[in-house]
């Protein structure tokens, strides 16, 4: 009996480790509506001046995951197809959470199934534009 329990525990532990190390195939375009608050101006969110009051916008945001190596992802993201930015990300050990960064901000995503992810993006006023952005939305995989 002790041998059987040990064998079952070993099989379950191996399955859990394998599951934590693998990630679903996420390559392709993911797009959706995001509610965004912007303080200041930048190329993605132009305004009449850098000292503007916070503005709320609804935008369509796209992540094109061009490559994947296990839990590592990379590609381009944009709210304006003329201003695509590179990003890199990784799926965490839970197999559902993604964290990453682009040239001036960071993103957190949660995989909700084969064709849905929830995502949030922020960037601080450390870049040349000195703008601050926070945005969240739901992404659908393009068919």
Each predicted region: which residue ranges?
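Positively charged n-region of N-terminal signal peptides that target proteins for export
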Residues: 1-4
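Bacterial N-terminal signal peptides
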Residues: 6-15
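Sec/Tat signal peptide C-region and signal peptidase I cleavage site
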Residues: 16-20
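Beta-sheet ligand-binding and adhesion/scaffold domains
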Residues: 22-24, 31-47, 90-143
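Residues that flank catalytic or metal-binding motifs in active/ligand-binding sites
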Residues: 26, 59-61, 135
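Exposed regions on extracellular, virion, or secretory-pathway luminal proteins
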Residues: 27, 53, 69-71, 81-85, ...
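Beta-strand secondary-structure signal
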Residues: 29-33, 62-64, 74-76, 118-120
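N-terminal glycine/threonine-rich, aromatic-flanked beta-hairpin/loop signature
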Residues: 41-86
């Amino acid at each position: 009996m002790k041998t059987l329990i040990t064998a079952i525990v070993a099989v379950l532990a191996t399955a859990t480790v394998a599951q934590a190390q693998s990630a679903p195939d996420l390559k392709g375009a993911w797009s959706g509506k995001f509610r965004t608050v912007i303080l200041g101006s930048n190329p993605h969110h132009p305004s009449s001046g850098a000292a503007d009051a916070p503005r709320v916008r609804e935008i369509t945001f796209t992540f094109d995951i061009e490559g994947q190596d296990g839990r590592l992802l990379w590609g381009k993201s944009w709210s304006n197809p003329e201003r695509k930015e590179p990003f890199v990300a990784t799926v965490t050990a839970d197999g559902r959470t993604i964290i990453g960064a682009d040239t001036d901000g960071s993103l957190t995503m949660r995989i909700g199934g084969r064709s849905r992810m929830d995502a949030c993006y922020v960037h601080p006023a450390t870049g040349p534009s000195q703008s601050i952005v926070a945005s969240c939305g739901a992404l659908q995989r393009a068919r």
